[in-house]
Design a protein with these regions (language model features):
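Positively charged N-terminal leader segments that act as targeting/secretion signals
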Residues: 1-7
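The feature marks the mature, well-folded catalytic cores of soluble enzymes
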Residues: 11-322
Length: 322
């Protein structure tokens, strides 16, 4: 095979996982602060909006605003409308219970909170299939929750889909054994560590890896100060450096404003980094300049979703590679 053909082959081989064909998002019908998840999601806050209906209305407005910006950037967004049949206050965060992979493969995950398990709704896949998206293989890890083991999708794991590495910060919601099982099934190399943030002068585990770390093709945004073990920190830095990624550090105060909960999406127009307005406002000029070398920054206000749900823009998006 000629050199050009080899290069072209590898580009085509990687294209499915490099370029996002489309996105799944769940439009909420019952969004509110989830008491079940607040046990270990310490990013959730009680906000001044008192009425449940007002919280829902604000969250829908924020959701629709983000969708509009995604579409404007050229991304196909499949929107599944949640209903009131099930008590699913966190349905707006689908990336925790389902991930999509090349070769028409999906994975379904075990969830810590009982009311989040209701989000695994067959109707979501039926909706996507009605849009001519086909899925030939399902890896279902959900039964592990019956034994008290959890792995909440790309919340628990930050995937480097090009270099096939899964970065995973352990917590009540993230099992080391399940991470290893996923990595065996999908041929990823696990990089497992612990990360913390300071709450009332005490170091508490960060509930999801994607709050402290955002993986992009050419760079990684990460709060290295949240990793207390020097050996674990050095291992991550080496892994990122070996993959020739520029490391863009954020502080713990920026982490608290969801500066780690961003997502790079790439299409024919180029690389875009989507984030919340609060995350963007937390960045300094140097960080913005570093990101802008590689990606167009797009930010959207999701204050209600962040404060009530304890998650931000990255959590709202499930990338589809099909």
């Amino acid at each position: 095979m000629a050199h050009f053909d080899v290069v072209l082959f590898h580009l085509l081989e990687n294209k499915m996982e490099k370029y996002v064909n489309s996105i799944l998002m769940i439009r909420p019908s019952n969004f509110r602060r989830n008491i079940e998840t607040s046990k270990n999601n310490l990013f959730q806050k009680k906000i001044k909006i008192e009425k449940k209906q007002n919280i829902l209305e604000e969250s829908i407005k924020e959701f629709d605003g983000l969708v509009s910006k995604l579409i404007k950037c050229g991304f196909k967004v499949y929107i599944f409308q949640d209903d009131l049949k099930s008590d699913t206050p966190d349905s707006i965060f689908p990336n925790n219970w389902i991930t999509f992979h090349e070769n028409k493969t999906i994975a379904v995950y075990p969830m810590f909170a009982k009311n989040r398990r209701l989000e695994r709704d067959r109707r979501v896949l039926e909706y996507l299939e009605s849009k001519n998206l086909k899925f030939d293989q399902v890896y279902d890890y959900s039964e592990a929750e019956n034994e008290g083991f959890y792995l909440e999708g790309t919340g628990s794991m930050v995937l480097d889909r090009i270099n096939k590495k899964a970065y995973c910060s352990l917590s009540d919601r993230t099992s080391s054994d399940l991470t290893m099982e996923f990595c065996d099934d999908f041929n990823y190399m696990p990089i497992i560590f612990n990360s913390y943030h300071t709450i009332n002068y005490k170091r508490k585990p960060i509930y999801h890896t994607n709050v402290m770390m955002c993986m992009a093709i050419k760079y990684c945004i990460i709060c290295l100060n949240s990793i207390d073990c020097n050996e674990e920190k050095e291992n991550i830095v080496k892994s990122l450096t070996d993959d020739k990624k520029e490391i863009i550090e954020i502080s713990e105060s920026q982490l608290e404003l969801f500066a780690g909960n961003m997502i790079e999406l790439i299409n024919e127009k180029g690389s875009f980094l989507f984030m919340s307005k609060s995350a963007y406002k937390s960045l300094d000029n140097n960080q913005i300049d570093k990101i802008s070398k590689y990606s167009t920054i797009i930010y959207s206000p999701v204050y209600t979703i962040e404060n009530c749900g304890g998650g931000s823009v990255r959590c709202m998006i499930a990338e589809i590679f099909n």
